Amino acid sequence: MEKLTTMMNIEQVREYALKLCGVTEDQPFGDDVVTFRVEGKIFLCLWLGGGKYDLAYQPRFACKLAPERNEELREHYGAITPAFHWNKKHWSDVYYTLLSTELVEAIIRESHQLIISTLPKAVRAKYQNA
């Protein structure tokens, strides 16, 4: 029997991001978006719906990934596109309700790890075994 693939909802995305080491959340861009950060650096931006940037709400988040990884994911998945209002080379919009939970979690982890890899060595050390 084939294994059923589950999709994430907005609360599951939020909860998963907050479980990662050192993550904080805030709303610097208004009430319609939550950002998730490591050491003050944004790795994920979760749209809550409505607001001036998302009038026709479609569940999505923007995340930072390596440029070549963004290209690869966009080629393979129609639910991953260049991010709206972000540097399209480095950021992708992920329409998480159209993708498997496993893939969405992997993308969030990858984005989190990318930001950690850019931190100063002394700061990065506290995340190595997390």
Task: Describe each model-derived feature in a short phrase.
Residues 1-130:
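Charge-dense, helix-prone N-terminal extensions
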